[in-house]
Amino acid sequence: MWYDPSSNVVVYNSPDPLALAAALPEARQLTNGYVGVPASLPNLATLANLGLTIPRVMDHRYDWPIHPSKRPLAHQKTMANFMATHPRSWNLSDMGTMKTLSALWAADYVMSQYPRGTCRCLIVAPLSTLQR
């Protein structure tokens, strides 16, 4: 699998390209068993449900905050990528791992991929976290 950020397409070398193309109507068969799939969030969720490795699209297509105190750590980027590509996911990490920021970044990315007002998100956090 490789990801082309310029065209936002994921390319898989599939042993059964017809099955992958049948599961994803937007998939296009390329040469020698390769299949190109547009890296939209619904397609990525389907690929993940099929057990395929999916790219970390937020690393390429999201403008992470540049303020030094809000710069995401590696584990926060991993969690935000996971939550953005796995609908209805939960982040039950330990206290102090900055779950709320990861969830906010994931929600911001997901909402930017859909028409305004068509995507909703619920983030549950203690009041003390929101006051900081």
Residue ranges and their predicted role:
Residues T53-D94, L101:
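Conserved pre-motif I regulatory segment
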Residues A84, S112-P115:
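Residue-level signal for alpha-helix termini/capping positions
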